[in-house]
Amino acid sequence: MEDRIVTPLNIRGDAESEYSLRPKSLKEYIGQRKVKEKLKIFIEAAKNRKEALDHVLFYGPPGLGKTTLANIIALEMGGNLKITSGPAIERAGDLAAILTGLDDRDVLFIDEIHRLNRSVEEILYPAMEDYALDIVIGKGASTKSIRLDLPRFTLIGATTRVGLLTAPLRDRFGVLCPMDFYDQEELSEIVVRSCNILKIRIEPEASVEIGKRSRGTPRIANRLLKRVRDYSEVKGNGTIDLKTSKAALELLEVDKEGFDSIDNKILRAIIDNFNGGPVGIETLAYFIGEELDTIEDVYEPYLLQKGFIIRTPRGRIASDSAYKHFNKTRKSSNAYHKNLKQSSLFDGEV
């Protein structure tokens, strides 16, 4: 799964290219208009007051620019960026060491913050609220707590599973930023910007085609661009035109919807093996041989956003769009419309 060309997760070779293509300011940053508007106002206000920016939570599918925005915030605030992740902070002492190493206006970015263990998370509460670190020393009757002052820093949390955050942690973030999939026009613009930086010649129709198949995700758009560039240099004349881009994407097995073999495997399983659904997510994960979390975090968000699957109280069902994608006809529409009606009442995850 790590080497899947359309995965929104980081794979080998992404880090170097993402660094060179990463925008350095909100003005350069394409997409996420509402998030940018919020950040622009709050950053300017914090700078005018000579204060640290309030703590920020980014949540949404992977690959949408959370780390890039964290880097921009650090640059705008004139501080350094320290990057870590929830699973990497195993003990309270690990987090204490990070916090005491920060300076005023520095930004601490914790990816997968929903995976912090509870003892580590509790260290964050006074750090976020009071810029203080409570340390317990001694044992038994001689136990006492010492409070250390911390620099005025900004914590930025990122998560793909905001529902897994505890309420006490979530409530301590002053700026909440939901991240949405990018539209085709934004992705095409990102492709053109990347081409300018990498000195790649591309025709407008080709940038649209690559953007259309990028699953609403800039990371995927840039990854596809690099592979289409390779194809163009070997099979074409070095300029990416529409014909070349389509041929390259077909070779990569990325179809017009941005689906690859695994997406199609999921949809075919629901349609062919479970009569269009509903099928429980655990059953579906077992059937196609993938981890439950991988289905929910990586594959499902885009299929839901595209309207190819629908969540209901009884499980996932394939939509009419999914059937049309495979030129198939639903055997019975009565059960589908009944489940579809129930889905409007669905208020949780199955």
Swiss-Prot record:
Residue spans crossing the bilayer: none
Small ATPAse domain (RuvB-S) as annotated region, ranges: 183-253
Molecular function per GO: ATP binding; ATP hydrolysis activity; four-way junction DNA binding; four-way junction helicase activity
The keyword Protein transport is assigned to this record: no
Region (Head domain (RuvB-H)): 256-350
Pfam family, one: AAA_lid_4
Binding site for Mg(2+): 67
Role summary: The RuvA-RuvB-RuvC complex processes Holliday junction (HJ) DNA during genetic recombination and DNA repair, while the RuvA-RuvB complex plays an important role in the rescue of blocked DNA replication forks via replication fork reversal (RFR). RuvA specifically binds to HJ cruciform DNA, conferring on it an open structure. The RuvB hexamer acts as an ATP-dependent pump, pulling dsDNA into and through the RuvAB complex. RuvB forms 2 homohexamers on either side of HJ DNA bound by 1 or 2 RuvA tetramers; 4 subunits per hexamer contact DNA at a time.
Family: Belongs to the RuvB family.
Domain remark in the UniProt entry: Has 3 domains, the large (RuvB-L) and small ATPase (RuvB-S) domains and the C-terminal head (RuvB-H) domain. The head domain binds DNA, while the ATPase domains jointly bind ATP, ADP or are empty depending on the state of the subunit in the translocation cycle. During a single DNA translocation step the structure of each domain remains the same, but their relative positions change.
Name this polypeptide is given: Holliday junction branch migration complex subunit RuvB
Species name: Clostridium kluyveri (strain ATCC 8527 / DSM 555 / NBRC 12016 / NCIMB 10680 / K1)
